[in-house]
């Protein structure tokens, strides 16, 4: 078992032991675990390390090549020499060897030079791609974390609705038995209860998916009770810089995806030059030294020590059209890389604009939802009084309560949407880092579990429920039967 797997197992066991003590996995804790345990990020690390070797591979074509070769063998031959005196035969049985040390250095090799520049561009592309994947990990952790908490808020809201509708249903039944209500009131309340139950089930499915995604990132089993909830004192930070133009310019200059595609254009351009180099001559310097004994029949029983130095020139004349076709193919690929870059620039700027609008409007949106919640809560209380006075009917109360819970759900969603939009804005601008995640993490309450801390439409709020048990389902059915 590797040390990394051992630490992951120990952390999972630690969570299981402390789960009942309301242990909270903070947002930063989750990110630090993801750095070590997320398979996608670990694969990105290895890809980056492999990509860094492109520079050395390209440079190797410009450096000298030193080769040593040695050959030793034994030969047997029958030699017949024809002279004026007749034929003479000789049997030869001898050892031979050839030892050579050679050095080659390119002097003019445009293909090697293009390959070197392409290798540098490929290494830079790998750096930028890894920078993008590093920032993306921050976003993935945040979105999985907030997705699970948002689903928990929706579960608790659905439970609050069910409790309210259950009480209203019981009231409708009593009034119907006394002759003060109608069967329609009971059916309306039952329909709203069933809808809230369906919403709770849907929220639980969403929460389970978010938790499984977070587990995949951190490499340890998690439950919603392990996460630190959103605090009461939620603040919307003013954007810095404040203008969209500044964020646009920042994205064009710093976005790692755009930077990697610019390097991809360079790689494609040097690929064209590398293929075009096959039209050009090559000039190289060579030097060698060698020793041999009986290296051939002509040097039988002779020893040689040979040193040589010179230049070698090769000029391509005709390759059957291969060079021209390869150059054209590389040119089309280069043009494609330009269009890929243009498309990514437009997509990135659209996302920057979208995240900028969401971030800059979040403060007003959250304030509006807070006012909506207050107004809806007041409407619920007023509607109850109106029903008691005989002015309103049961459906009016159900609609008022539905509006209240809908506003509370939108308020919760707006807060989480702001956090992810703010982080994604910095991600698309290419400046997202761990310090930004620390600012986001300050909105969560460490050491607590995600229990509901919001006002309810009733004075007695239902306690948080972490699992939907069979008993709960049976109780829900019995309340409506």
From Swiss-Prot:
The keyword Membrane applies. It is found in: Cell outer membrane. Residues 462-481 are annotated as: Disordered. It comes from the Bacteria. Disulfide bonds: none annotated. Coiled coil: none annotated. GO terms for biological process: secretion. InterPro entries: Bacterial_OMF, OMP_efflux, T1SS_OMP_TolC. Keywords: Cell outer membrane, Membrane, Transmembrane, Transmembrane beta strand, Transport. Involved in the secretion of alkaline protease. Belongs to the outer membrane factor (OMF) (TC 1.B.17) family. This is Alkaline protease secretion protein AprF. The gene is aprF.
């Amino acid at each position: 078992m590797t040390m990394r797997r051992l630490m992951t197992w120990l952390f999972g066991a630690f969570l299981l032991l402390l789960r009942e003590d309301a242990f909270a996995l903070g947002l930063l804790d989750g990110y630090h675990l993801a750095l070590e345990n997320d398979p996608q990020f670990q694969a990105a690390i290895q890809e980056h390390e492999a990509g860094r070797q492109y520079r050395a591979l390209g440079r190797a074509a410009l450096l000298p090549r030193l080769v040593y070769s040695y050959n030793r063998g034994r030969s047997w031959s029958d030699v017949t020499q024809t002279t004026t005196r007749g034929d003479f035969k000789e049997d030869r049985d001898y050892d031979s060897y050839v030892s050579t040390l050679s050095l080659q250095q390119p002097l003019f090799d445009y293909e090697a030079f293009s390959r070197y520049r392409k290798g540098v561009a490929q290494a830079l592309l790998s750096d930028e791609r890894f920078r993008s994947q590093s920032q993306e990990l921050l976003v993935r952790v945040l979105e999985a974390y907030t997705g699970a908490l948002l689903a928990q808020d929706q579960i608790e809201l659905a439970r609050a609705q069910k409790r309210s509708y259950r009480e209203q249903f019981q009231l409708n039944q009593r009034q119907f038995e006394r002759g003060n209500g109608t069967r329609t009131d009971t059916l309306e309340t039952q329909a709203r209860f069933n809808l809230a139950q369906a919403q709770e089930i849907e929220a639980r499915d969403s929460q389970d998916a978010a938790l499984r995604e977070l587990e995949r990132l951190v490499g340890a089993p998690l439950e919603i009770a392990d996460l630190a909830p959103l605090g009461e004192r939620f603040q919307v930070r003013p954007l810095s810089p404040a203008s969209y133009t500044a964020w646009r310019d920042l994205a064009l200059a710093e976005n790692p995806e755009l930077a990697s595609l610019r390097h991809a254009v360079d790689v494609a351009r040097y690929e064209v030059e590398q293929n075009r180099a096959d039209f050009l001559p090559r000039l190289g310097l060579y030097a060698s030294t060698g020793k041999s004994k009986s290296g051939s029949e002509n040097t039988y029983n002779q020893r040689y020590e040979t040193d040589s130095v010179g230049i070698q020139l090769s000029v391509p004349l005709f390759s059957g059209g291969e060079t021209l076709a390869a150059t054209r193919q590389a040119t089309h690929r280069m043009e494609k890389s330009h269009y890929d870059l243009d498309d990514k620039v437009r997509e990135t700027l659209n996302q920057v604009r979208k995240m900028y609008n969401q971030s800059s409007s979040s403060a007003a949106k959250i304030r509006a939802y807070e006012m909506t919640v207050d107004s809806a809560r007041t409407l619920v209380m007023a509607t109850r009084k109106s029903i008691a006075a005989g002015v309103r009917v049961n459906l009016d109360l159900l609609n008022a309560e539905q509006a209240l819970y809908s506003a509370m759900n939108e308020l919760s969603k707006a807060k989480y949407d702001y956090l992810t939009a703010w982080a994604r804005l910095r991600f698309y601008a290419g400046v997202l880092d761990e310090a930004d995640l620390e600012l986001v993490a300050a909105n969560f309450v460490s050491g607590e579990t995600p229990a509901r801390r919001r006002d309810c439409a009733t004075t007695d709020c239902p306690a948080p429920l972490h699992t939907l048990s069979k008993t709960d389902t049976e109780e829900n059915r019995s309340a409506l039967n």
